[in-house]
Amino acid sequence: MSLLTEVETPIRNEWGCRCNDSSDSLVVAASIIGILHLILWILDRLFFKCIYRFFKHGLKRGPSTEGVPESMREEYRKEQQNAVDADDSHFVSIELE
């Protein structure tokens, strides 16, 4: 006898969804969490460079420059900009000639 004849097939009324109560609070909460997760994932993929630079450098503008000569301020600004530019070095820049 074949194994296929031994397998029980479900009857027609068991094919439907057993959880017909979609207004269950757990189902609603899971749906909301799933949608929020999807939105955050899409935003992360679109703006990952900005987001991670923000977390790395934060809102800090650096130490106070009160009483510091302008030449030293400019040197500090260049140094900070070079540090930010070095962070972008893992992106490949292709120039076509």
Curated annotation (Swiss-Prot):
Q: What's in the keyword line of the UniProt record?
A: Disulfide bond, Glycoprotein, Host cell membrane, Host membrane, Host-virus interaction, Hydrogen ion transport, Inhibition of host autophagy by virus, Ion channel, Ion transport, Lipoprotein, Membrane, Palmitate, Phosphoprotein, Signal-anchor, Transmembrane, Transmembrane helix, Transport, Viral ion channel, Virion
Localization terms from the record: Virion membrane; Host apical cell membrane
Fill in the misc note. When the channel is activated, one or more imidazole moieties of His-37 probably become bi-protonated.
Gene that encodes the chain: M
- Gene3D superfamilies, per this entry? 6.10.250.1640
- Stretches of the chain found on the membrane's Intravirion side: 44-97
In its UniProt entry, what is this protein called? Matrix protein 2
**Domain-level remarks:** Cytoplasmic tail plays an important role in virion assembly and morphogenesis.
Membrane-spanning segments: 23-43
The activity regulation comment is: The M2 protein from most influenza A strains is inhibited by amantadine and rimantadine, resulting in viral uncoating incapacity. Emergence of amantadine-resistant variants is usually rapid.
